[in-house]
Amino acid sequence: MERDFLGLSDKQYLSNNVKHEVNDDAVEERGLSTKAAREWGKSKVFATSSFMPSSDFQEAKAFPGAYQWGSVSAANVFRRCQFGGAFQNATPLLLGGSVPLPTHPSLVPRVASSGSSPQLTIFYGGTISVFNDISPDKAQAIMLCAGNGLKGETGDSKPVREAERMYGKQIHNTAATSSSSATHTDNFSRCRDTPVAATNAMSMIESFNAAPRNMIPSVPQARKASLARFLEKRKERLMSAMPYKKMLLDLSTGESSGMNYSSTSPT
């Protein structure tokens, strides 16, 4: 006959009983929660079936396995209730499918209005003018007219040399008075205020573009002149390096010329 003096067997027996009771309670709670979730899903399906078309309802009856609801926990239900306000504007899906997205105004694609008329912007004389309902053909015609008017404008236009002289004088005045800031700003404003005709600008550009063409024929002549100067200087260097030979050459040339003169003179 065994006796438990310390009472260890009673404590172990009590702890085992407590564990079994806790496990049984957890299993019962889990079974109740799953059962309640299934009942809630079925009631949801039957509640929404009144709003379903007859064809969808018949499909749900024909294929019950495709529309089964799984176990829904209390946390998911709380999340749906908490964030349900964000999906009020979304179109709900009846049985299964993807999660509906909220139709926020910033997510709506912006479609450009087809009735917007083309505009034409003109910059002229420091002003900006905008015209509506201008087709591309009209815009091209306006640009052609402006180009023809710019080429045909001849009134109140100064010659090119006068414009160049005035432009060079302004640059000279600006460089001479660059020491004082007041005179520099005065000259700058004077240069800015003096108008230059469009024809003068075009003629200046044409003259600058035509200048290299006029210089092309003078290039060979300049080369010939530099070559002649080079040969002349080389000849001078050679003559200065050998003066005695030059004297001998001069004497020989003088004697030969004297002999020729004596031979040709009558006796």
Swiss-Prot record:
A motif (Nuclear localization signal) lies at residues 222-229. GO terms for cellular component: nucleus. Keywords: Jasmonic acid signaling pathway, Nucleus, Plant defense, Transcription, Transcription regulation, Ubl conjugation. Ubiquitinated. Targeted for degradation by the SCF(COI1) E3 ubiquitin ligase-proteasome pathway during jasmonate signaling. A motif (Jas) lies at residues 220-244. It is found in: Nucleus. Residues 113-148 form the Tify domain. GO terms for biological process: defense response; response to jasmonic acid. Induction: Up-regulated by jasmonate, wounding and herbivory. It comes from the Eukaryota. Its main location: nucleus. It holds the Pfam family Jas_motif. SMART domains: TIFY (SM00979). Belongs to the TIFY/JAZ family. Homo- and heterodimer. Interacts with MYC2, MYC3, MYC4, COI1, AFPH2/NINJA, TIFY10A/JAZ1, TIFY10B/JAZ2, TIFY6B/JAZ3, TIFY5A/JAZ8, TIFY9/JAZ10 and TIFY3A/JAZ11. Interacts with RHD6 and RSL1. PANTHER family: PROTEIN TIFY 4A-RELATED-RELATED (PTHR33077), PROTEIN TIFY 7 (PTHR33077:SF90). The jas domain (220-244) is necessary and sufficient for interaction with COI1. Repressor of jasmonate responses. Jasmonoyl-isoleucine (JA-Ile) specifically promotes COI1-TIFY7/JAZ9 interaction. Interacts with and suppresses RHD6 and RSL1 transcription factor activities to negatively regulate jasmonate-stimulated root hair development. This is Protein TIFY 7. It comes from Arabidopsis thaliana.
